[in-house]
Amino acid sequence: MSKQSVVKTKKRVKRVITDGVAHICASFNNTIVTITDRQGNSLFWCTSGASGFRGSRKCTPFAAQVAAEKAGRAVLDYGMKSLEVRINGPGPGRESAVRSLSNVGYKITNIIDVTPIPHNGCRPPKKRRV
């Protein structure tokens, strides 16, 4: 007779997090939306590329809206009610991502622009000639 191995699995307890932080990184090529708790522990992330957009369609405001909506709906399971939004970068999906998070049903407590601005640091790249 062979021994039967018994595998014990622990049930994952869903944490209840009432408020969190939505980090929106909007570059010229893509938009990354990460939703964390107050301590910075990542709960869910989504990008324009992961939402099914490829190439030049990744950098559109609609792609950023879809990515933020997808991330917002995934975190509703935690019982989150309000979000603080931190926007980073100069991309075209900045405002549409914030608007879609509020349309999902979150109360936006405050919006902070955390884009790093140099005090005349590095020399910028040369101008494109097309």
From Swiss-Prot:
Keywords: Ribonucleoprotein, Ribosomal protein, RNA-binding, rRNA-binding. One of its GO terms (cellular component) is ribosome. One of its GO terms (molecular function) is structural constituent of ribosome. GO terms for biological process: translation. It holds the Pfam family Ribosomal_S11. Located on the platform of the 30S subunit, it bridges several disparate RNA helices of the 16S rRNA. Forms part of the Shine-Dalgarno cleft in the 70S ribosome. Part of the 30S ribosomal subunit. Interacts with proteins S7 and S18. Binds to IF-3. Belongs to the universal ribosomal protein uS11 family. This is Small ribosomal subunit protein uS11. It comes from Xylella fastidiosa (strain Temecula1 / ATCC 700964).
